[in-house]
């Protein structure tokens, strides 16, 4: 109505991921000082709001060496990183359903952070794509070795860090929900 102001709390609202950028700083501060110089952060990505928050923290001066856009088979952004062409498509249903996005609303924000320079985006953001079989395997593997249950989105993030962590590099992967939700 004309008397109400309506907003959204999902990742299209900058009011959500500005505060989200704070936990990137918090994570960095939790690391021992000797592990803060060479950090890789793997972010489960569907609508790319969380990755946008991390990149904003990086732009504000947080010394993150590399980000990984960890995606399920809905690989619109990984394909852009690989080819430089952004092509939306129908989403595919997966176990990591919050990442089932064929036209991520925050993609434009990411490219704008880099002045629409594909090579600059590609230099700071790597990608990893995981299918449901790989996601299930990661959940099982982490549980059997660590006794920790990953949610499907976190499993995709875990696989992204595994694919890109270099020797001597501190790696962090994010989760998005409690596994009981799934």
Question: Where are these predicted regions, by residue range?
Answer:
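PLP-dependent amino-acid enzyme catalytic core
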Residues: 1-182
